[in-house]
């Protein structure tokens, strides 16, 4: 089954309790509790330990891994030695194969995304499979002769990887999916998947293979409005159909009414997936009120530093401790801006890495991509400038219309994720000209 809900509605807590319930009521069962990335899995592991403080033995039958990490472990246990191809070990062969087949109109960027999202994503291993595949989300229409030319490139890449003893992460998960689909005993009786909206095609196929042996063997929790890593694809085509088996959480436990309602302006009231499942974002209710979020467009970086410094000063006056405060930016290129604001107030900064460990006595600084799963009493989202979010470099790399739409959607989702990490206080700042998203976050005539 699938459970959805906007940020702060308790999807992760429900997933944790679901995993514990499955282990408790099925004494011989093994349960996989998973997320799509290692940093998020690390955070989930810590939360499970806290939940099972009085039942530590229960945790022995619940394994917490990222999907790729458990894939690597199972591959080496059941298949053999594993050598995962790096991005460079795939990108350069694509470039070389492209040159080898002669002149054509396709850019290296197009070839790379076609490989990632279609050929490797769906693990197409024959010309016929590539010829007939529905290239969902790829708006560049390809005639059969164009597909044949492209396949000649990708076939060179596939054979080259095989000759070098390399396999992609998608390939690894595909081998495992076939292994279990062909009758091997699944390593888990149940799989509980949190942050499911960012699972890849190969990850969903792998989960479908290991979770098919039990009724309700698979449980997914996620929010399409927080999809920031994956392009949309059909879960049904990948082996998982949740139509008619979904529920939506409506009570927001984390975020004040003022912050939630302001952040909701960034997203449409309804978001549909490729299979036609619709997530209704209306009707969520927060359990408490708080100060109105502040949005400031400053004339310079120095003015922004002073504004955030003054905000930090007011938080200290209200009794907040540094570890209860976080500042998020789009990428590491903007880290100097939160550091300068903290320094103005004499506060130490802890730059979060993939372990997501905060430090007593320090406010946290992080990119928006690492914000998932985190919660702070006060959050500032800095450097929301034009060409920073949405990131101009991503826009310039776009090769087709559908990809541009997805860039805008995921960048908007990033800002939503960052803003909804705040419980009580939210400040969003930029220098002029500001990101176009700020005009959606709050009406233009209310910008300060």
Regions found by a protein language model. Give the residues of each.
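Conserved pre-motif I regulatory segment
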Residues: 1
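Conserved helicase motor core of SF1/SF2 NTP-dependent helicases
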Residues: 4-32, 36-84, 143-146, 152-166, ...
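ATP-hydrolysis module of ASCE/P-loop NTPase motor domains
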Residues: 78-146
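Short, electropositive alpha-helical surface patch
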Residues: 436-448
């Amino acid at each position: 089954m699938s459970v959805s809900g906007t940020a702060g509605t308790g999807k992760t807590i429900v997933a944790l309790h679901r995993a514990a319930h499955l282990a408790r009521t099925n004494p011989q069962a093994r349960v996989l509790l998973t997320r799509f990335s290692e940093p998020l899995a690390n955070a989930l592991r810590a939360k499970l330990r806290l939940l099972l403080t009085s039942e530590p033995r229960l945790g022995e039958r619940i394994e917490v891994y990222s999907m790729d990490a458990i894939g690597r472990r199972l591959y080496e246990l059941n298949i053999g030695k594993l050598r995962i191809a790096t991005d460079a070990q795939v990108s350069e062969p694509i470039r070389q194969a492209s040159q080898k087949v002669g002149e054509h109109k396709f850019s290296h960027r197009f070839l790379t995304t076609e490989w990632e999202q279609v050929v490797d994503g769906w693990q197409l291993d024959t010309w016929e499979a590539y010829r007939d595949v529905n290239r969902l989300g790829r708006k560049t229409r390809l005639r059969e002769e164009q597909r044949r030319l492209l396949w000649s490139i990708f076939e060179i890449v596939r054979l080259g990887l095989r000759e070098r003893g390399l396999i992609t992460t998608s390939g690894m998960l595909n081998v495992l999916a076939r292994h279990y689909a062909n009758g091997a005993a699944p390593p888990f009786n149940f799989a509980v998947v949190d942050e499911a909206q960012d699972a890849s095609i190969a990850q969903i196929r792998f989960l479908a293979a290991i979770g098919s042996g039990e009724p309700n063997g698979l449980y997914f929790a996620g929010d399409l409005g927080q999809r920031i890593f994956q392009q949309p694809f059909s879960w049904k085509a990948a082996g998982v159909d949740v139509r008619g088996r979904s529920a939506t959480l409506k009570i927001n436990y984390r975020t004040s009414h003022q912050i939630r309602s302001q952040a909701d302006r960034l997203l449409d009231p309804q978001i549909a997936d490729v299979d036609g499942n619709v997530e209704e974002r209306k009707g969520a209710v927060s359990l408490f009120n708080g100060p109105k979020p502040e949005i400031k467009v400053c004339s310079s970086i120095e003015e922004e530093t002073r504004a955030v410094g003054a905000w930090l000063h007011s938080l200290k006056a209200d009794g907040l401790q540094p570890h209860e405060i976080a500042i998020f930016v789009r990428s590491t290129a903007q880290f100097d801006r939160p550091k300068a604001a903290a320094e103005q107030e004499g506060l130490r900064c802890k730059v979060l890495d993939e372990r997501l460990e905060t430090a007593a006595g320090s406010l946290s600084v992080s990119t928006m991509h690492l914000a998932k799963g985190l919660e702070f009493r006060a959050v500032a989202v800095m450097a929301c400038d034009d060409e920073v979010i949405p990131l101009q470099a991503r826009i310039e790399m776009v090769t087709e219309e559908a990809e541009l739409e997805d860039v805008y959607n995921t960048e908007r989702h990033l800002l939503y994720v960052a803003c909804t990490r705040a419980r009580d206080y939210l400040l969003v700042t930029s220098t002029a000209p500001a990101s176009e998203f700020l005009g959606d976050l709050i009406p233009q005539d209310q910008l300060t």
